[in-house]
């Protein structure tokens, strides 16, 4: 008879201490770091000033690679840099057109007021006594 295979033990296991339990306390799981890849792709495709969207895309890809490798701290750092570059890219994309629009509106209002004042000046009738 072959006894190489384990057999079922007919004896019931007896615990060494009655009521002894092992409890593991785990902290709250941290959410995985964000890489902002979609935002970086849109920033890159919009072709903003100084190629900030391209830099954001590079850091987003680095963050995703580090997350896959398991280095969550490096992924968090690269994701933070990608977020900063995305914010800068959005600001460089939105602020200059808004400033230009503000300058055009204030310039148009100033020219309208200037034209109104000059029209009033040229419509004034002078008497002959004013030239003496």
UniProtKB/Swiss-Prot annotation:
Native organism: Homo sapiens (Human)
Subunit organization: Interacts with FKBP11.
GO biological process terms on file: bone mineralization; bone morphogenesis; in utero embryonic development; regulation of bone mineralization; response to rapamycin; response to tacrolimus
Subcellular location: Cell membrane
Superkingdom of the organism of origin: Eukaryota
Signal peptide: none
Keywords from the UniProt entry: Cell membrane, Developmental protein, Disease variant, Lipoprotein, Membrane, Mineral balance, Osteogenesis imperfecta, Palmitate, Transmembrane, Transmembrane helix
The keyword Electron transport is assigned to this record: no
Membrane topology: Multi-pass membrane protein
Disease: Osteogenesis imperfecta 5: An autosomal dominant form of osteogenesis imperfecta, a disorder of bone formation characterized by low bone mass, bone fragility and susceptibility to fractures after minimal trauma. Disease severity ranges from very mild forms without fractures to intrauterine fractures and perinatal lethality. Extraskeletal manifestations, which affect a variable number of patients, are dentinogenesis imperfecta, hearing loss, and blue sclerae.
Membrane topology, Cytoplasmic segments: 58-86
InterPro entries: CD225/Dispanin_fam, IFITM_antiviral_protein
Tissue: Detected in osteoblasts and fibroblasts (at protein level). Detected in bone.
Protein name per Swiss-Prot or TrEMBL: Interferon-induced transmembrane protein 5
GO cellular component: cytosol; intracellular membrane-bounded organelle; plasma membrane
Region (Disordered): 1-21
Basic and acidic residues: compositionally biased ranges: 1-11
């Amino acid at each position: 008879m072959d006894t190489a295979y384990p057999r079922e033990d007919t004896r019931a296991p007896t615990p060494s201490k009655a009521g002894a339990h092992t409890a593991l306390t785990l902290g709250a799981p941290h959410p995985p770091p964000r890489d902002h890849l979609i935002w970086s792709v849109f920033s890159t495709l919009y072709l903003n000033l100084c190629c900030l969207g391209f830099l954001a895309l590079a850091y987003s890809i680095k963050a995703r690679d580090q997350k896959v490798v398991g280095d969550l701290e490096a992924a968090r750092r690269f994701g933070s840099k990608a977020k900063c570059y995305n914010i800068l890219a959005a600001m460089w994309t939105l602020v200059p057109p808004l400033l230009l629009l503000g300058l055009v509106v204030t310039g148009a209002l100033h020219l309208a007021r200037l034209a109104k004042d000059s029209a009033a000046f040229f419509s004034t009738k002078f008497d002959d006594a004013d030239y003496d």
